[in-house]
C-alpha cells in the first residue's frame, strides 16, 4: 500500500533549554549523592515524561514544603519559589537545593533592586503560574502589581506614576508582551525598563523557530505539557503566523490525525521542557502513516550552559 507523501519541518532550536537541563541534572545528582527519596517541591519542569522518569528514579514530587520530611533533601523547581520557602526550609534545618533557572533568578534580583530603590513593581505574567508566584513572592505582599493583558494596564492603581518599574515572566509571547510594554510606557512614561529583556533566550529562539517554518506548513504540532507556559505560547505564535491547525501534544498518542487530513507539510516544535525522545516518537508516528521527508530548519545555535549548585559538586554528607 502506497503511503501519501508528507514533509515534516522540524523547528530548531527546540526542546530542553539550559535552565531545564540544569534542573533535571540537579534532581539526578541529588539522587546520586543522597539516595532516594529526594523530595521536589512542584514538578521540577512542566513535562510529565520527565517527571515520571525522575519519579521512577526515586524523586517524590510534592506541592508544599510541609509534605516533605525534614530529614530528607528537598529541591525547588526551575520556576522559582517565593522567598518564604527557602526561609522556612532553613528554619526547619532542611537540606535544600534551589533549581531555579538562573535567568528567573536574574528577574528576582532585578525586582529586589528596584524595590530597594523605592520603585513599585509591575509584573507582566500569568496569574497562578509558579514562576509568577515565585517572582512576586520575592517582595512583600502588595509590592508587585500583576498585569496579564493590555486591558489590565488601564485599570492599574499605582502609588506614584513616577516611581515604577516593570519585569516579566521569562516564558511569555514576545509579541503580546511588546504590546503590554507599549501600553505601560504610554500610560507611565517614567517607568523603568529592564536592563535586558526578561523573556529568556530559549523562549525567544523557540518562538522565532516556529515563525520561520510557519509559512511552509499546513499544520503545526507543539510537543509540550498543557501546563507549560512556553509550549502554549508556541501554539499561539503558530496560529498568529497563519497556521490553520496548531496542536499542543504531550506524546505522539495525543495527535489528532483527523485534523491533519489533507496536510502535506507539518511543522514540529517542542517546548523548553520537552525531551528530544518525544520528538523522535512523533517522527516515528508520521513515518508509520506517511511517506515522510524530514527537514530541519535551524534559526540559531544555542550554546548556553548553567552550572549546578556547589552543594551537588561537594562530597556527600548524611542530610
Swiss-Prot record:
Dimethylallyl diphosphate binds at residues 46, 79, 129, 228-230, 273. [4Fe-4S] cluster binds at residues 17, 101, 200. GO terms for molecular function: 4 iron, 4 sulfur cluster binding; 4-hydroxy-3-methylbut-2-enyl diphosphate reductase activity; metal ion binding. Belongs to the IspH family. Keywords: 4Fe-4S, Iron, Iron-sulfur, Isoprene biosynthesis, Metal-binding, Oxidoreductase. HAMAP family: IspH. Isopentenyl diphosphate binds at residues 46, 79, 129, 228-230, 273. Catalyzes the conversion of 1-hydroxy-2-methyl-2-(E)-butenyl 4-diphosphate (HMBPP) into a mixture of isopentenyl diphosphate (IPP) and dimethylallyl diphosphate (DMAPP). Acts in the terminal step of the DOXP/MEP pathway for isoprenoid precursor biosynthesis. Its cofactor is [4Fe-4S] cluster. Gene3D superfamilies: 3.40.50.11270, 4-hydroxy-3-methylbut-2-enyl diphosphate reductase, catalytic domain (3.40.1010.20). (2E)-4-hydroxy-3-methylbut-2-enyl diphosphate binds at residues 46, 79, 129, 170, 228-230, 273. Its EC number is 1.17.7.4. This is 4-hydroxy-3-methylbut-2-enyl diphosphate reductase. Binds 1 [4Fe-4S] cluster per subunit. Coiled coil: none annotated. The active site is at residue 131. It is an enzyme of class 1 (oxidoreductase). Pathway: Isoprenoid biosynthesis; dimethylallyl diphosphate biosynthesis; dimethylallyl diphosphate from (2E)-4-hydroxy-3-methylbutenyl diphosphate: step 1/1; Isoprenoid biosynthesis; isopentenyl diphosphate biosynthesis via DXP pathway; isopentenyl diphosphate from 1-deoxy-D-xylulose 5-phosphate: step 6/6. One of its GO terms (biological process) is isopentenyl diphosphate biosynthetic process, methylerythritol 4-phosphate pathway. It catalyses: isopentenyl diphosphate + 2 oxidized [2Fe-2S]-[ferredoxin] + H2O = (2E)-4-hydroxy-3-methylbut-2-enyl diphosphate + 2 reduced [2Fe-2S]-[ferredoxin] + 2 H(+); dimethylallyl diphosphate + 2 oxidized [2Fe-2S]-[ferredoxin] + H2O = (2E)-4-hydroxy-3-methylbut-2-enyl diphosphate + 2 reduced [2Fe-2S]-[ferredoxin] + 2 H(+). CDD domains: lytB_ispH. It holds the Pfam family LYTB.
